[in-house]
Structure formats: structure tokens, C-alpha cells
């Protein structure tokens, strides 16, 4: 049969060409609309369509389950029950009368046509063979005309054969059609019978499954019997003496004996372990550090294999050896695994990369100048004169206790000033001020000279590699000595330009204003030499100079912008805190919408009060900023806990002696972050070996009810620095008589804490000798035992006082006077030069020549 086009086939099967092409593609035959299909491809397509029609919408699919329980004996002799479920699926097709008839007719027509084509092909082949034989027998002398005649004859015969076949096909088609009608009737009858016998068939399937299960059980029983029979035969056979086999069989027999109750129960399930043929390469995720055992677990191999590989690479370690990221990566890659390096701060790196850094065009910025020096040397007064304000007048105790950031516009140019405290407790503040500054102005009083905090300021400036300008203040005083200041500073490598050094010295008076303009000129000249520049566009970066909690506005941070533009509405990430900027205020308290480089501003909108010195970064996504902040907080907490739990010999001995140490528990509240850091640091330095300062709570803002409750529970004192307690806290403090103290000057706070620590010190006892008596004779008393007849040689002997007995100037006994008599009369004391009888409690070994030393114990107050 010749090839058929897809259009003809679609008409025959009654399927659209598109669906036909789709079905052909499913079975792996790619065709287009104009293509032809051969007989083999047609047969495959028809089989596919027939199987697809089996599970049509009129198909009923039923599942049958047969359950059985098996008992399996384990290694320990115990039996384990296993549920076995056999599932069987049956499909029942609804017989659609017209569709089935048409489909069967089509199918039979196709079969009939296939049979005809095959018979015709066979006849043609035979006919061609006969012609070839005839032609071979004929001689070569025949002409071409005879060949043409033969060919004409052959063609005539072909036409006759075709006519004959067509007539034959029409007759056979009628017969086949009648047969198909009969077959369809038989199928309908059988389908009805299947529907009637639905319950019967399902029952038969269930019975069949049970029979199969019973057969398996019987086979297992037979096998079990054979094993026992073979064992008995081997046991009786004297020639069989292989020890290894005997032991193994005895072991199996004993096991069977133990489980004799269940020996008839079959074992159908068996677990088989197959060893992997090749090494499986895995994706190994490695963080910053990993132990050898964890690395082995991730690669799904034994730890010994990893250690072997490490030794080959020249790394010696145990199973608990901690590997760094690079080493672990080398080992894993050496063993053929793919390494995925996990960075814990990946989100932080991502958020920092996704920032608009501006056009990278730098512009000249104002210098950041830090004023440093000893306390009361006139730092704030000098700044007040420059700013034309009176800050020092309003400050408690006349001393600065926080970093003040101010932006001053002068006729010569703009300068940002940072005023730092000079007290020794504010070391951290001063060092932080130097880290963010460009120039340091060292203020030294002409009448006072170089002081401890002056030296400390010089050290901070040198560490930060910042140029120092020396301002010699208070030159208006009569006792000022400028040359003495210059000579003192020379010891610390601060030399004036006049003396061949690098530092500029300016004599000023904060009171009269003398030399102030010269100082400003020098600052701007130094800034010009430094060529201070910063990018003025893009997302801002800065540093927290100071932070505090405002009762009405919430957490507030004073931020000095380093580069970019800090705008209202920006999302900022600041240490452990984050937030969206709600408000920006300058040093004068005026609200601004943006701030550029070297401009200090107050930022409102952070989640909590940040730490001074934290870096402020503007980011795009607030959600990611929150995640980074919480991650930083968690890492800091983990680090703190790991340091606390670190055990060594020193800590162990400290814990043993801990009971002998007194603790002064303190809850500290301050107005700003810088003061809080300074006070807590100074308090912890006051701790001694006998009295420890323990700060159980510290924070920024007023004293709350929570602070009062914590003080009550932990028996602590509450210290408030420039803050007050609220109403609810006052109620608890008054009702429970808690110790609450307010301070505005750091000196007073430290002095009172020292006094409280002195009260906690264990008292010191001193022995004061009040009299000496020499033993001249001894005699016995029925009431007191041995009595010493003595002469008082020095001081006064008092009754019931503690005594020492000395023999050859060595203390041999320490006790108490029990009896003191003179001329048979009890007395309370005997003075120098008189004789007396002394009875000593629980001691009878008194000899002539011993000296009795009488003393009294006095309690001495200790000072820190």
C-alpha cells in the first residue's frame, strides 16, 4: 500500500490535522500538514489512539487493596510486625454504541486494506520473477521490438489484474461489514455481563491475592524445613568437621530455637544494602570556620578519610580540629566536591554595594576642629567667644560633660568645632573626638601649665596622626608664664615653629578675645594645607558624635556627616540601630532638610539610642537595614556570651574566692550616651579586690518603674546623672525606701560611690597591749586550778580581757583571764607595781618567769 497523506488519514480517522500532528509528536514522530505517513507509522499511531481511548471519561478505574501482617525476627531475638499491602488496579470502559461501531468499522477497513496491499505486493513480486526467468532463457539475438511487445503485454495484464482485484475487494468489504456488526453485538453482551458480575470479579481478585500470599508462606515453610534437615544431617555426619561452618549453623539454630513460637511465621521482606559504585560529588556549604567532623558530615564520608587527606596535604589535626574557610575549601575541592562559600555578612555587603555614591566629584569641605585640654583650662569659654554664646555658664559645675558639635561661619570661612570634656573619666570621649577630627587645638592655661589630661590629649592626637595647634589661654592673668608652657610641652615633642618645630603656638584670652582672630586664621591656613575634600552628592555617610533619649521626641543622635548628602526621609543604618529620618536639626536647633560634609546635625527617627562612635550609613531598603541591625546585635551578643563562658584556671580560683568579695550593685541612668560610657568606665575602675562594683542596669533617659523594680529585686542603689525619676518610680522608691541619688557633676558621683564602697569593706582589728605581769610563784586552787602569783610590771591588768602567755619571748598560749584577786578579794583591775593572783581559763601549764600580756582589740575603719 502506498504512503497516505495526513489530510486523507485525518478524514478517515475523523480527527483534525492539528490533533493528529500533536498525537504523532507524543509518540516521537514529527510531521507537518503536507507530509505523508507510511504503513508502519500508521500502525503505531492507531495503537496509540486505541490505548488512549481505553482511559476516557467513560472509564471506571477501581483499586483493590489486600492487607496482611508479617512478623520478622530481628537480631536481638525480638519480633517485628510489618504491615504488607497489595494493591491492584482495574479499569472498566463504558461501551458507547455509535462510537464503538464507527471505531471498529474504521479499524477493520484499515486492516482489510492492509491485507489487500500485502497480497497484491506478493503477486507482483512473483510475476516479476517469472518474467525475469523467461527473459534469461531467451537468446540475445531477439530484437528490441520483441521486448517492446512483451512490455505491452505485461502492461495489459496488469490492467486486467487491477480490474479483477477491484471487483474482489468490493465483495470482501460487504462480507467484512457483516462480520463487524456481529462482533459489536458480542462485545455489548460481554460488557453487560461484566457489569452484572462486578461484585463477583472483585471477590475473585481478592481470593486470587490471598492464594498468592498463601503460596509464598508455604514455600517459606518448606525452605525452613530443608534448612533444619540439612543441619541435622551435617551434625550426624562425623566426617564434617569444619569449625567455622559448625559455629555459624549452631548460632542460626539457637536463634530459631529462641523464636520457636514464631518459627512457623514467614519472613517475606528483606532489606538489601547496595554499596555506591562511584563517589557522589556534593555541594558543600562552608562558613567562616568548621570542624573536621562537621566537614566530613557535609561530604557524607568518614572523619578518618578527611584526616588522611589532610595529612597528605601536610595538615595535622584531630576530629575536633577547627579549620578556617580557605583550608576547608582546599580539602573539600581536593576530595572532588563543589564548595559554596557562605559569608555570614553577605546581606550587609549586598546592602552596602546597592548604594548611590554620587558622581565621585570631590569639593572642598570645612575643617573639623577638636578642642582638647585639661579640665578648667578654658576650652568651652574659648569656643563660646568664637560662637558668641555662654555655654560654660549653663553647664553643671562649670565643666563640660559631653561632646558638643558646632558649625561656625566666620568672615574667613566655615569651621566645625567639637568641644570635648577634660575630666579624666571622659577618656573615651576624647579619643572618639580625635578619630573624627582634622585638626586638634590643645588649650593650655598659662597659669596652670601642662596637666595630666593635657598629656593624654597629646597622646590621642599623636595616635590619630592629627596636626596640633597649641592655644595658650588665660594670658590676661598676672601669674601667666608662656615660656614655662613652651618648655613643658617640649618634653612631649610639641615644639613651636619659632623654636624649629612643626606646631603653631597662639596666645589667646577667652575672656578679652585677644588672639582669637589669629587662631581662626591659623586653623583655616592649616586646613588649606591639608586640602580637605569630600564628595557632596549621593547617599551620605557619617559618624555619631553624641546620642541621648529625649522624653518628648525619642532617641536622638548628633551625627557629623563625612560625605554625601544626609536628607530628611533617608533610611539609615547605625550600628545596632536603624530607622527613617523624621527630622534634621542644626546646632542652633533650627530644622533643616539636608546636611553636607563636615556639618553636625541632630537626627530623629532611630529605633533606639545608638552608641557614640557608630558609623551612620544611608541605605535603600528599610527591611534589609532592620535585618542587618538585628544580625549585628546577635553577633555582638554571641561574642559577649562566649567571653563570659570562657573558663581557665584563673577564673576557677576567682570563683572560689568570690564569696569573700563584697559587691556594690548600681543602676545607672544618664542623659546622654557619652556621659553614660564615661561614668560606667570610671565606676568599674574603682573596684578593688575586696569590693567590686557591679552595674546591673544602665541606660539613657529618666528613671522608670522598671529601674525601681530591678533595684528592689537586686538590692541595688540608683544613680541618676542629669535625669529624674518619674511618678510611678517615685512611688516604689518611697514605699520600699530605696537608695536614690541625683548628680549633675561627675566628681560628686565618684566621691559618694567611694564612700559607699568604704562602708562595704570588712573592718580591720588592731591589738592594743594595756599591761604586763611577771609570774613570781604558782599555787593550786580547788576552784580555778593552777593560780599564778604575779607582779604587774607595766600598765593595767583588767579582768576578762584576752591575754598572751610569753615564755622566752615566744607566745605559747592565747586565752582569757578567768580570775583576778588581790588579798583573796576579787578585783576588776590591778595597776602597775602591785601583786595579784591570776587564774587563766582552761590552762594549767604556768611556770615561774612567764610573762602574761594583757591586750584589748580595737576595730579600725578602712579607707580605699
Swiss-Prot record:
<feature type="region of interest" description="G5">
    <location>
        <begin position="509"/>
        <end position="511"/>
    </location>
</feature>
<dbReference type="InterPro" id="IPR023115">
    <property type="entry name" value="TIF_IF2_dom3"/>
</dbReference>
<dbReference type="Pfam" id="PF00009">
    <property type="entry name" value="GTP_EFTU"/>
</dbReference>
<dbReference type="Pfam" id="PF22042">
    <property type="entry name" value="EF-G_D2"/>
</dbReference>
<dbReference type="InterPro" id="IPR044145">
    <property type="entry name" value="IF2_II"/>
</dbReference>
<dbReference type="GO" id="GO:0005525">
    <property type="term" value="F:GTP binding"/>
</dbReference>
<dbReference type="InterPro" id="IPR006847">
    <property type="entry name" value="IF2_N"/>
</dbReference>
<dbReference type="InterPro" id="IPR009000">
    <property type="entry name" value="Transl_B-barrel_sf"/>
</dbReference>
<keyword id="KW-0547">Nucleotide-binding</keyword>
<dbReference type="InterPro" id="IPR004161">
    <property type="entry name" value="EFTu-like_2"/>
</dbReference>
<dbReference type="InterPro" id="IPR000178">
    <property type="entry name" value="TF_IF2_bacterial-like"/>
</dbReference>
<dbReference type="Pfam" id="PF11987">
    <property type="entry name" value="IF-2"/>
</dbReference>
<dbReference type="GO" id="GO:0003743">
    <property type="term" value="F:translation initiation factor activity"/>
</dbReference>
<comment type="similarity">
    <text>Belongs to the TRAFAC class translation factor GTPase superfamily. Classic translation factor GTPase family. IF-2 subfamily.</text>
</comment>
<dbReference type="GO" id="GO:0097216">
    <property type="term" value="F:guanosine tetraphosphate binding"/>
</dbReference>
<dbReference type="InterPro" id="IPR013575">
    <property type="entry name" value="IF2_assoc_dom_bac"/>
</dbReference>
<feature type="domain" description="tr-type G">
    <location>
        <begin position="364"/>
        <end position="533"/>
    </location>
</feature>
<dbReference type="GO" id="GO:0005829">
    <property type="term" value="C:cytosol"/>
</dbReference>
<feature type="region of interest" description="G3">
    <location>
        <begin position="419"/>
        <end position="422"/>
    </location>
</feature>
<feature type="region of interest" description="G4">
    <location>
        <begin position="473"/>
        <end position="476"/>
    </location>
</feature>
<keyword id="KW-0396">Initiation factor</keyword>
<feature type="binding site">
    <location>
        <begin position="419"/>
        <end position="423"/>
    </location>
    <ligand>
        <name>GTP</name>
    </ligand>
</feature>
<keyword id="KW-0963">Cytoplasm</keyword>
<feature type="compositionally biased region" description="Basic and acidic residues">
    <location>
        <begin position="140"/>
        <end position="171"/>
    </location>
</feature>
<dbReference type="Pfam" id="PF04760">
    <property type="entry name" value="IF2_N"/>
</dbReference>
<feature type="region of interest" description="Disordered">
    <location>
        <begin position="140"/>
        <end position="179"/>
    </location>
</feature>
<feature type="region of interest" description="G1">
    <location>
        <begin position="373"/>
        <end position="380"/>
    </location>
</feature>
<dbReference type="InterPro" id="IPR000795">
    <property type="entry name" value="T_Tr_GTP-bd_dom"/>
</dbReference>
<dbReference type="InterPro" id="IPR005225">
    <property type="entry name" value="Small_GTP-bd"/>
</dbReference>
<keyword id="KW-0648">Protein biosynthesis</keyword>
<protein>
    <recommendedName>
        <fullName>Translation initiation factor IF-2</fullName>
    </recommendedName>
</protein>
<comment type="function">
    <text>One of the essential components for the initiation of protein synthesis. Protects formylmethionyl-tRNA from spontaneous hydrolysis and promotes its binding to the 30S ribosomal subunits. Also involved in the hydrolysis of GTP during the formation of the 70S ribosomal complex.</text>
</comment>
<feature type="region of interest" description="G2">
    <location>
        <begin position="398"/>
        <end position="402"/>
    </location>
</feature>
<feature type="binding site">
    <location>
        <begin position="473"/>
        <end position="476"/>
    </location>
    <ligand>
        <name>GTP</name>
    </ligand>
</feature>
<dbReference type="Pfam" id="PF08364">
    <property type="entry name" value="IF2_assoc"/>
</dbReference>
<keyword id="KW-0342">GTP-binding</keyword>
<dbReference type="GO" id="GO:0003924">
    <property type="term" value="F:GTPase activity"/>
</dbReference>
<dbReference type="Pfam" id="PF03144">
    <property type="entry name" value="GTP_EFTU_D2"/>
</dbReference>
<feature type="binding site">
    <location>
        <begin position="373"/>
        <end position="380"/>
    </location>
    <ligand>
        <name>GTP</name>
    </ligand>
</feature>
<dbReference type="InterPro" id="IPR053905">
    <property type="entry name" value="EF-G-like_DII"/>
</dbReference>
<dbReference type="InterPro" id="IPR027417">
    <property type="entry name" value="P-loop_NTPase"/>
</dbReference>
<dbReference type="InterPro" id="IPR015760">
    <property type="entry name" value="TIF_IF2"/>
</dbReference>
Amino acid at each position: 500500500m502506498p504512503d497516505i497523506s495526513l489530510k486523507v488519514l485525518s478524514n478517515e480517522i475523523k480527527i483534525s490535522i492539528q490533533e493528529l500532528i500533536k498525537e504523532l509528536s507524543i509518540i516521537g514522530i514529527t510531521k507537518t500538514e503536507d507530509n505523508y505517513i507510511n504503513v508502519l507509522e500508521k500502525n503505531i499511531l492507531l495503537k496509540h489512539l486505541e490505548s488512549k481511548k481505553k482511559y476516557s471519561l467513560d472509564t471506571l478505574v477501581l483499586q483493590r487493596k489486600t492487607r496482611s501482617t508479617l512478623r520478622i525476627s530481628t537480631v536481638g531475638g525480638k519480633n517485628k510486625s510489618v504491615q504488607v499491602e497489595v494493591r491492584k488496579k482495574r479499569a472498566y470502559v463504558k461501551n458507547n454504541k455509535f462510537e464503538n461501531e464507527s471505531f471498529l468499522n474504521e479499524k477493520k477497513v484499515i486492516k482489510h486494506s492492509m491485507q489487500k496491499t500485502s497480497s497484491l505486493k506478493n503477486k507482483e513480486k512473483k510475476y516479476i520473477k517469472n518474467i525475469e526467468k523467461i527473459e534469461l532463457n531467451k537468446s540475445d539475438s531477439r530484437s528490441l521490438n520483441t521486448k517492446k511487445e512483451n512490455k505491452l503485454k505485461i502492461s495489459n495484464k496488469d490492467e486486467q489484474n487491477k480490474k479483477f482485484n477491484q471487483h474482489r475487494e468490493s465483495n470482501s468489504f460487504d462480507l467484512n461489514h457483516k462480520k463487524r456488526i456481529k462482533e459489536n453485538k458480542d462485545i455489548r453482551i460481554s460488557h453487560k455481563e461484566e457489569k452484572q458480575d462486578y461484585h463477583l470479579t472483585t471477590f475473585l481478585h481478592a481470593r486470587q491475592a490471598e492464594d498468592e500470599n498463601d503460596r509464598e508462606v508455604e514455600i517459606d515453610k518448606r525452605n525452613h524445613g530443608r534448612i533444619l534437615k540439612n543441619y541435622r544431617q551435617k551434625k550426624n555426619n562425623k566426617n564434617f568437621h569444619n569449625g567455622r561452618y559448625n559455629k555459624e549453623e549452631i548460632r542460626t539454630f539457637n536463634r530459631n530455637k529462641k523464636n520457636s513460637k514464631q518459627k512457623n511465621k514467614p519472613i517475606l521482606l528483606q532489606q538489601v544494602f547496595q554499596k555506591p559504585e562511584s563517589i557522589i560529588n556534593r555541594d558543600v556549604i562552608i562558613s567562616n570556620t568548621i570542624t573536621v567532623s562537621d566537614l566530613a558530615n557535609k561530604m557524607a564520608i568518614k572523619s578518618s578519610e578527611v584526616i588522611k587527606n589532610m595529612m597528605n596535604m601536610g595538615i595535622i589535626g584531630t576530629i575536633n580540629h577547627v579549620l578556617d574557610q580557605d583550608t576547608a575549601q582546599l580539602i573539600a575541592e581536593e576530595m572532588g566536591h563543589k564548595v559554596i562559600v557562605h559569608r555570614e555578612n553577605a546581606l550587609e555587603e549586598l546592602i552596602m554595594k546597592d548604594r548611590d555614591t554620587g558622581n565621585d566629584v570631590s569639593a572642598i569641605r570645612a575643617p573639623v576642629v577638636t578642642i582638647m585640654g585639661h579640665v578648667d583650662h578654658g576650652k568651652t569659654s574659648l569656643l563660646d567667644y568664637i560662637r558668641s554664646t555662654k555655654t560654660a555658664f549653663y553647664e553643671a559645675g562649670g565643666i563640660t560633660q559631653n561632646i558638643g558639635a558646632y558649625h561656625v561661619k566666620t568672615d574667613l570661612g566655615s569651621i566645625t568645632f567639637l568641644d570635648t570634656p577634660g575630666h579624666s573619666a571622659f577618656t573615651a570621649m576624647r579619643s572618639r573626638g580625635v578619630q573624627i577630627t582634622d585638626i586638634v587645638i590643645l588649650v593650655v592655661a598659662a597659669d596652670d601649665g601642662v596637666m595630666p589630661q593635657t598629656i593624654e590629649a597629646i597622646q590621642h592626637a599623636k595616635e590619630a596622626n592629627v596636626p596640633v595647634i597649641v592655644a595658650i589661654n588665660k594670658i590676661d592673668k598676672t601669674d601667666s608664664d608662656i615660656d614655662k608652657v613652651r618648655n613643658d610641652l617640649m618634653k612631649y615633642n610639641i615644639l613651636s615653629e619659632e623654636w624649629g618645630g612643626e606646631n603653631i603656638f597662639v596666645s589667646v584670652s577667652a575672656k578679652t578675645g585677644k588672639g582669637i582672630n589669629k587662631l581662626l586664621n591659623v586653623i583655616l591656613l592649616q586646613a588649606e594645607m591639608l586640602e580637605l575634600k569630600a564628595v557632596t552628592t549621593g547617599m551620605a555617610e557619617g559618624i555619631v558624635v553624641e546620642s541621648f533619649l529625649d522624653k518628648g521626641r525619642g532617641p536622638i543622635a548628633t551625627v557629623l556627616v563625612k560625605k554625601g548628602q544626609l536628607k530628611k526621609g533617608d533610611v539609615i543604618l547605625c550600628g545596632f540601630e536603624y530607622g527613617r529620618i523624621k527630622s534634621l536639626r542644626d546646632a542652633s536647633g533650627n530644622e533643616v532638610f539636608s546636611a553636607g560634609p563636615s556639618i553636625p546635625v541632630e537626627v530623629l527617627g532611630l529605633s533606639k539610642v545608638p552608641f557614640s562612635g557608630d558609623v551612620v550609613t544611608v541605605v535603600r531598603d528599610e527591611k534589609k537595614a532592620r535585618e542587618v541591625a538585628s544580625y549585628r546585635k546577635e553577633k555582638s551578643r554571641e561574642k559577649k556570651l562566649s567571653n563570659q563562658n570562657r573558663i581557665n584556671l584563673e577564673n576557677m580560683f576567682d570563683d572560689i574566692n568570690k564569696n569573700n568579695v563584697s559587691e556594690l550593685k548600681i543602676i545607672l541612668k544618664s542623659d546622654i550616651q557619652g556621659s553614660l560610657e564615661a561614668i560606667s568606665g570610671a565606676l568599674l575602675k574603682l573596684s578593688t579586690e575586696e569590693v567590686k562594683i557591679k552595674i546591673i542596669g544602665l541606660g539613657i533617659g529618666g528613671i522608670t518603674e522598671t529601674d525601681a523594680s530591678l533595684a528592689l529585686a537586686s538590692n541595688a542603689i540608683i544613680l541618676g546623672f542629669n535625669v529624674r525619676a518619674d511618678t510611678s518610680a517615685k512611688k516604689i522608691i518611697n514605699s520600699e525606701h530605696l537608695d536614690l541619688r541625683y548628680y549633675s557633676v561627675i566628681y560628686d558621683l565618684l566621691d559618694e560611690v567611694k564612700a559607699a564602697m568604704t562602708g562595704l569593706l570588712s573592718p580591720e582589728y588592731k591589738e592594743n597591749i594595756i599591761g604586763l605581769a611577771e609570774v613570781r610563784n604558782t599555787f593550786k586552787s580547788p576552784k580555778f586550778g593552777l593560780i599564778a602569783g604575779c607582779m604587774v610590771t607595766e600598765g593595767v591588768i583588767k579582768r576578762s580581757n584576752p591575754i598572751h602567755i610569753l615564755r622566752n619571748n615566744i607566745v605559747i598560749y592565747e586565752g582569757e583571764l578567768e580570775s583576778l584577786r588581790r588579798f583573796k578579794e576579787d578585783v576588776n583591775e590591778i595597776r602597775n607595781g602591785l601583786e595579784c593572783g591570776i587564774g587563766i581559763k582552761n590552762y594549767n601549764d604556768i611556770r615561774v618567769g612567764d610573762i602574761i600580756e594583757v591586750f584589748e582589740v580595737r576595730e579600725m575603719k578602712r579607707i580605699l
